[in-house]
Regions:
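Residue-level recognition of alpha-helical coiled-coils
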Residues: 370, 374-377
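A conserved structural/catalytic subdomain of Rossmann-like adenosyl-cofactor enzymes
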Residues: 1-370
Length: 377
């Protein structure tokens, strides 16, 4: 059982280890060999030690006994989702779910603690799951199970009664047969996703205008190349960057100029603009160059039918035909949201009740204007 501090920086702990930065940590509790990565980091942000406590406890779980080990830790909501894919917090969640360590996560009401009003979550972990729980996680929403205190204790204004605690235990023990209003069971992979990079082709229009030439002259200080452009390319326009560069390189060499990467980059910087109607730009190997300004990321659920390819065909290609996914960029992340699974929409009032209220207001204000101006309306 553990109740780690919320949002307390652990810089002083680094000093106790004799370490200056968290990137220098090599402790096997927090840097493990996993997923073909000998330096797989479970280290959270320096401002919140909750998941550091969790990783530490996981490293101490017994594997040689019949019952193994069981961990219950109280965390705030950030442990459910903080950290991008590949970061320490996301890696720890991934490790927990992929190693099938999480039995349940229980959401508790706000204002249960003396010094904080935020909602909290109980992480229930074990390395010896019952057969029926293997490969699955139970989420229990106990946020409505509270009774107000007669007198507040700091931020604490409510508590869970004995009957409420028994109700949570009943839900936990019932597992997949529990009341679905309060309990839901999912496959571990439900909370995992691929974060992938979606690219669109770079399209450049060339325009060797007077303004661009003047900016080039003042910024680059390459008089030889400037004179060449003024003489040979002034007012040139093209929607095919590769064709323009190819011809420019040949004519520059023919004129005795050295063609360099610096000069080619200068052409891009000062004489091109992106244009969706221009031709696609290709690199030296003939590959389509991506437009960094149009680069986007998508989260593809691990359980998405057809995987990354299926997601692209269904969710991206119909809207951006020339886009492509860089599958080498795929990083696995894990996060979850209780709101997503236990969302309860606000019950709207019946229209007849609203109309009745409006009519009542009209009646109560009848004659008000007349009394104000001293006459009848």
């Amino acid at each position: 059982l553990s109740n780690p501090p919320f949002g307390t920086p652990w810089k002083t702990d680094l000093k106790a280890w004799g370490i200056g930065k968290k990137d220098e940590i090599s402790d096997s509790r927090f840097i493990i060999n996993y997923d073909d990565n000998s330096e797989y980091s479970l280290i959270p942000d320096i401002g919140d030690p909750q998941m550091l406590f969790l990783a530490n406890n996981i490293s101490k779980m017994k594997t040689t006994t019949e019952l193994g080990s069981r961990i219950i830790e109280v965390h705030n909501g950030s442990s459910l989702f903080t950290g991008k894919p590949g970061s320490g917090p996301s890696n720890l969640r991934r490790y927990i779910f992929e190693q099938d360590l999480c039995e349940a996560i229980i959401a508790i009401s706000e204002n249960m603690f003396y010094n904080t009003g935020i909602g909290t979550y109980l992480w229930v972990l074990t390395n010896k799951k019952d057969e029926k729980r293997k490969g699955k996680v139970q989420l229990i929403d106990a946020t409505s199970m509270k009774e107000p205190l007669r007198k507040n204790l700091g931020d604490k204004n409510c508590e869970m009664t004995q009957k409420m605690r028994e109700k949570v235990m009943e839900l936990y023990l019932a597992f997949d047969k529990a009341d679905s209003e309060y309990s839901k069971v999912f496959l571990n992979e439900e909370f995992g996703f691929y974060q992938v990079e979606v690219n669109q082709p770079l399209r450049l229009r060339v325009n060797v205008s007077d303004e661009a030439l003047e900016e080039f002259k003042n910024s680059v200080k390459d008089d030889e190349f400037y004179d060449f452009l003024m003489t040979n390319e002034k007012d040139t326009e093209s929607t095919n960057f590769n064709s323009f560069i190819g011809k420019l390189e040949k004519s520059a060499k023919k004129a005795g100029l050295k063609w360099t990467k610096k000069r080619e980059n200068a052409i891009r910087k000062y004489f091109t603009t992106t244009d969706e109607n221009a031709d696609v730009v290709l690199d030296k190997k003939g590959n389509i160059e991506p437009d960094n300004n149009l680069k986007d990321t998508e989260q593809v659920p691990l359980l998405y039918d057809g995987g990354i390819t299926g997601f692209f065909e269904n969710e991206v290609k119909p809207y951006v035909e020339d886009a492509w996914i860089n599958e080498d960029s795929a990083v696995i992340g894990y996060e979850l949201s209780f709101t997503k699974y236990f969302y309860k929409p606000v019950q709207l009032r019946d229209l007849s009740d609203i109309i009745a209220d409006i009519r009542a207001i009209e009646q109560s204000t009848d004659g008000l204007l007349a009394s104000i101006i001293g006459g009848e309306v």
